Regions:
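Surface-exposed loop/turn elements that mediate protein-protein interactions on large endomembrane-trafficking
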Residues: 1-28, 43-68, 88-114, 137-161, ...
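Short beta-strand elements that form the blades of beta-propeller/WD-repeat-like
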Residues: 1-9, 32-44, 75-88, 127-137, ...
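Repeated scaffold domains used in trafficking and secretory/extracellular systems
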Residues: 24-37, 65-80, 114-127, 162-174, ...
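Eukaryotic tandem repeat interaction scaffolds
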Residues: 128-235, 528, 537-625
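Hydrophobic multi-pass inner-membrane translocation pores used for secretion
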Residues: 160-172, 178-180, 205-230, 239, ...
Length: 677
C-alpha cells in the first residue's frame, strides 16, 4: 500500500506484488496494512472495515461497540480477528484479541502486561506477531516499553525498556529494532537487539538530523530512513533508505528516497520510495546473490526521483515600451529546487542573474523582470539594453539527491529608439568628455532622471583624442541602425559623424568642411515631421539655419535652409524635442540676460513666436536637450552650473506656459567637468 498527498489530501493505492498493477483505494480515511498479508483496515469510530486485496472479496465491517463499551481501536490480524485496545470503564487498559465467530464477537485478553498499562500504539507485523508500545504506571521514567506479542498464544513474549522515547519499530524472528529519540533533539539512535536479550547487547547506530525515522529488518540487515525528501530545503543522508549489516560495519544505499516500508513475503520488504534510475514507486527489497540488500521496482508512480526539467513559459519578445515588466516561469519536478537563471545580452555580454521562486501552491519557478540590469542596488534602476538575450537555467536539488539540471533559451527586448541613447536601453545617456579626453556615456540610475556615476559603469565612446573637437553634439539617429549618433566639429571647421551601434560608436565619417562659420550647433530633434533627426546651426551673423536629416551616412543632411535672422541675441540654443504642444521638436534659447525662451516647432522646420520660460538661466554654463529621461512623453533639459560643476535636470511637463518642473540635481555632481553633452 502506498500513500500520496495532493493539496493536503491523502489518497491511498494498492499495488499487486505479482504484476505491479495499482488500484486506487476509496476514500481519504487512513488505511492500515497488516504486515506480510493483503489485509487493509480502515477505521471510522468503533467500526473497522477489512479489505482482503488478495482475494478481492467484498469488504467486511465489524463494529467493536457490539462487543462492549471501551473498544475504540483495532487493527486486523487476520480476515476475522483484530488486535484491539480496550479501555476498562473502571480505569486502565487491556490488550485484547477480538475474533468474529458464527455466534458473534469474542474477546481474549493478551497476558504479560502490568495492570493499568496505557497502550500507545499497536502495529501488526504479521498474522502471528504484533509490536506494542505501552507505558507502565509503576515506571516513573514514563518511557514507553516495547513488547512483542505472540498473537496465537495471546501473550507478550519479549519486553524491553528503551533509554528514550521510541518512534519507528520493527521485528523479525531473530531481532527487534527501534529508534530512540531524546526529547527536543534532532539526533536519533537506531537500536537493534537479538530477541531474548537486553538492550545492553544491542547494536546502536547514532544518527543526526533525524525526524520521523523508520526502521525495518531483513535477514541479517537493519534498514532505516526517513521521508520528506521531496519537500526538503536542505540535504540529509537519511532521506534515502540505508541498509546496515548486523554482522559487520557494512552500509549500503538501497533507495535514494524513502517514505515507508512494510514486510513482504519470503523475508523480503516492500518500500515506497525512489531511485535516480527508476524514479518513484514501490520497490521490493531483497537480498542479492552477494547477500546484500538491493531494490527491484515493482511499480512506478510516474514521478522522477532525480530533479527533472519539465517546461518553461518565457516570452519570445518583450516590448518594454508597452509593458513595464515581463513574467518568466519554469516548471521542474521539485518545487524546492534551488534555481538560478543567467540572462545574457548577446551584443554586449552583460549578464543578469535572477533567482526565480515558487508562489503559493504553484510548482512553477516564477520571476517578474522589471527590465533593469539588476534586482539589487546599486544598479536597480538602469534599464537593460534592447536586443537578443540568451537565458540559462541551473536548478540544483535542495535535498541533494541527484545532479543539477540545466536548460537554455532565448528572448528579445525591444523599445522604440530615443534620442541621446548610446547603449540602446530606451533612456537617454549623459555624454561626458573626461579629463583624459576620452568620451563616455553615463546611464541614469533611476528612470526619473537621478544619476549616480559611482555606481554605473559608463559606456566608452572613444579613448582619448576628443580634445581635437571644439563642438560635440549628441543627437538622435541620423543614419544607419536605429541608434543615437554623435556629431563633432574639429578646430579646422570639419564636421564629422560618428554612428551609434548600441554599444559604442563606429569610425567617424566626414560630413563636410566650412562649419567654423557657426558658433552654435544643436540637434537631437525631428523638426520637420519626417521622423529623421535634423540639425540647427546659428552663424556668427545671427542667422539660424536648418539642416534637414536625410538618413544617409555619406550625406546625412540636405542643403541648408534659412530659419530666420537675429538669433545672435542668444548665447545658447538647444533642440530639445517635444516639450509642449504638437509632436514636432521644440527649441529653447537663452538670451544674454539669462532669460530662457521656448519656440514651439510647427513640424515644417519653422517655429511659433517665442514664449518666455523664465530668467536666471545665466547661472548655467550651458543648457542642452537631453531626450525624455523619465519616459513620460515630454523632452527634458539639462542645465550645467559652472561653479561648482553641478548638472541639473528639468523635466518636461507638456505645458507651454510652464514647460519644465523645478530642477532636480544629478548625484555625484563633482565627478563631472563642464564637458557634458
Amino acid at each position: 500500500m502506498t500513500r500520496y498527498s495532493a493539496d493536503g489530501v491523502f489518497s491511498y493505492a494498492w499495488t499487486r506484488y505479482a504484476d505491479g498493477s495499482t488500484t486506487l483505494l476509496p476514500g481519504s480515511r487512513p488505511y492500515v496494512q497488516t504486515g506480510r498479508t493483503d489485509l487493509l483496515t480502515q477505521g471510522e469510530g468503533t467500526v473497522r472495515t477489512v479489505r482482503d486485496m488478495g482475494t478481492g472479496s467484498e469488504p467486511v465491517a465489524t463494529d467493536l461497540a457490539h462487543l462492549a463499551p471501551g473498544y475504540t481501536s483495532g487493527v486486523a490480524s487476520g480476515p476475522s480477528s483484530f488486535v484491539t485496545v480496550w479501555a476498562d470503564p473502571e480505569g486502565g487498559e487491556e490488550l485484547h484479541i477480538v475474533t468474529r465467530t458464527a455466534t458473534g464477537l469474542r474477546a481474549e485478553k493478551v497476558t504479560g502486561f502490568p495492570e493499568g498499562a496505557d497502550f500507545t500504539s499497536v502495529a501488526i507485523d504479521s498474522p502471528h506477531t504484533a509490536l506494542v508500545r505501552y507505558v507502565d504506571p509503576a515506571d516513573t521514567t514514563a518511557v514507553s516499553h516495547l513488547a512483542v506479542v505472540d498473537i496465537e498464544r495471546r501473550a507478550s513474549v519479549d519486553d524491553v525498556t528503551p533509554a528514550h522515547a521510541t518512534s519507528g519499530t520493527a521485528v523479525s524472528p531473530t531481532h527487534l529494532a527501534w529508534v530512540e529519540t531524546p526529547a527536543n533533539s534532532t539526533t536519533a539512535t537506531v537500536v537493534v537487539m537479538p530477541r531474548g536479550t537486553t538492550p545492553d547487547d544491542a547494536l546502536r547506530i547514532p544518527l543526526r538530523m533525524a525526524a520521523g525515522l523508520r526502521v525495518a529488518l531483513i535477514d541479517g540487515w537493519v534498514l532505516y530512513g526517513q521521508g520528506g525528501a521531496h519537500e526538503a530545503y536542505r540535504t540529509n543522508p537519511l532521506y534515502g533508505l540505508t541498509a546496515r549489516s548486523l554482522t559487520d560495519e557494512r552500509s549500503v544505499k538501497v533507495l535514494d528516497t524513502f517514505d515507508r516500508a512494510v514486510p513482504g513475503p519470503g523475508g523480503t520488504m516492500l518500500a515506497q520510495g525512489g531511485t535516480l534510475a527508476g524514479g518513484e514507486g514501490v520497490y521490493r527489497i531483497l537480498l542479492g546473490a552477494d547477500g546484500v540488500p538491493a531494490a527491484e521496482q515493482v511499480a512506478s508512480d510516474g514521478r522522477p526521483t532525480a530533479l527533472t526539467y519539465l517546461s518553461e513559459d518565457v516570452p519570445e519578445v518583450i516590448d518594454l515600451d508597452q509593458d513595464k515588466s515581463a513574467d518568466f516561469s519554469w516548471r521542474l519536478s521539485n518545487r524546492q529546487a534551488l534555481t538560478v537563471v543567467k540572462a545574457t545580452h548577446v551584443a554586449t555580454g552583460r549578464t543578469l542573474t535572477w533567482s526565480p521562486s515558487t508562489r503559493g501552491l504553484s510548482d512553477a519557478k516564477r520571476y517578474t523582470w522589471n527590465g533593469a540590469l539588476s534586482d539589487y542596488m546599486p544598479e536597480s534602476g538602469v534599464p537593460a539594453p534592447n536586443g537578443a538575450y540568451t537565458w540559462h537555467l541551473t536548478a540544483t536539488p535542495a535535498n541533494g539527491i541527484g545532479p543539477a539540471v540545466e536548460k537554455s533559451g532565448t528572448f528579445t527586448v525591444k523599445r522604440a529608439p530615443v534620442p541621446h541613447d548610446y547603449d540602446d536601453n530606451g533612456v537617454p545617456d549623459l555624454v561626458h568628455r573626461e579629463y583624459d579626453n576620452s568620451l563616455v556615456a553615463h546611464n541614469p540610475i533611476t528612470p526619473l532622471g537621478a544619476y549616480n556615476t559611482s555606481y554605473t559603469q559608463p559606456l566608452s565612446l572613444g579613448t582619448g583624442g576628443w580634445q581635437i573637437y571644439d563642438r560635440i553634439v549628441a543627437t538622435g539617429d541620423l543614419a544607419g541602425p536605429p541608434h543615437s549618433d554623435l556629431l563633432a566639429r574639429d578646430r579646422a571647421g570639419v564636421l564629422w559623424l560618428y554612428q551609434g551601434t548600441g554599444k559604442g560608436l563606429t569610425r567617424r565619417v566626414q560630413v563636410g568642411g566650412g562649419w567654423q562659420v557657426y558658433d552654435k550647433l544643436t540637434s537631437a530633434a525631428d523638426l520637420t515631421g519626417d521622423n529623421r533627426t535634423d540639425l540647427l546651426a546659428a552663424d556668427k551673423a545671427g542667422v539660424l539655419w536648418l539642416y534637414k536629416g536625410t538618413g544617409s551616412a555619406s550625406a546625412p543632411f540636405a542643403k541648408r535652409t534659412k530659419v530666420g535672422s537675429s538669433w545672435g541675441v542668444y548665447n545658447n540654443l538647444a533642440a530639445v524635442g517635444n516639450v509642449a504642444g504638437a509632436a514636432a521638436g521644440d527649441l529653447v534659447a537663452r538670451d544674454r540676460a539669462g532669460v530662457l525662451w521656448l519656440y514651439l516647432g510647427k513640424g515644417d522646420g519653422t517655429f511659433t513666436a517665442r514664449t518666455r520660460i523664465g530668467g536666471g538661466w545665466q547661472a548655467y554654463d550651458h543648457v542642452f536637450g537631453f531626450g525624455d529621461v523619465d519616459r513620460d512623453g515630454y523632452a527634458d533639459l539639462i542645465g550645467l552650473a559652472e561653479a561648482p560643476n553641478k548638472p541639473y535636470v528639468y523635466r518636461g511637463t507638456g505645458l507651454r506656459t510652464t514647460p519644465f518642473t523645478a530642477r532636480q540635481p544629478l548625484y555625484n555632481d563633482a565627478y563631472f567637468s563642464l564637458d557634458l553633452y
